[in-house]
């Protein structure tokens, strides 16, 4: 009686699609009330150094801390969109560090092409008016982005 052949031996080894890799990138900014801070590809050192590789936003984590309270709203954009596709809603920063996670909604997670314009906004954070005093609070914000990179074989030429 002949031994049974495994089904695995019949599969093609090279038929799989190229894998994408996840990259985490962090930037530190100062957020001021009544001001909007925008983040482009050039804001994140790793994305900036990736050349013309396309990327997709998986999630943003926003952590803020400050001596004075400040309300803010973060907005996520798709490539080519002028209107935001998702937002955190009004959040409050204070002396205790708070972390907010912002992810794209299903069906709204498109690829930013490798030749994305430097001025194209990926994320924007609005500092909202939160105090009645004359001193406008300034807050330190840590923005960590998780990006999915396209395989290098698919990069723009």
Curated annotation (Swiss-Prot):
List the GO molecular function terms. structural molecule activity
Give the source species. Satellite panicum mosaic virus (SPMV)
Lineage per the UniProt record: Viruses, Riboviria, Papanivirus, Panicum papanivirus 1
The residues that cross the membrane are none
UniProt protein name: Coat protein
Task: Tell where it localizes.
Answer: Virion
Principal location class: virion
What keywords does the record list, in alphabetical order? Capsid protein, Virion
Any Pfam family hit: Potex_coat
- GO CC terms on record? viral capsid
